[in-house]
Amino acid sequence: MRKIIIDGRDFENIEVLHDDLKDKLDFPDYYGRNLDALWDCLTGWVDLPLTLVLKNFEFSNTFLGSYADDVLEVIQEAQEELKDEFKIIIE
């Protein structure tokens, strides 16, 4: 299973968060940089199986506020949808 690490200390703002996700998860150029587009790409674009490691997630909350929780919710819902093909680890 492929493993990708995302570090919450890197997310100064929402744009940087989405740019990092796009780059590390190899989303298409037309990725919309919003929660709906995140869901679409996680459930229909990324190569599976995949483990996504969210390091230093508490920093995401510091920089992004409640938006970090919204992103986490989308990622968790994708994990439920994709069963054993997509896993998240929060550190």
Swiss-Prot record:
Disulfide bonds: none
Cell compartment(s), UniProt: Cytoplasm
Gene3D superfamilies: Barstar-like
Annotated InterPro entries: Barstar, Barstar-like_sf
Family annotation (CDD domains): Barstar
Keyword line: Cytoplasm
One Pfam short name: Barstar
Any one GO cellular component localisation term in the record: cytoplasm
Family: Belongs to the barstar family.
Protein name in the entry: Putative ribonuclease inhibitor YrdF
Source species of the chain: Bacillus subtilis (strain 168)
Gene that produces this protein: yrdF
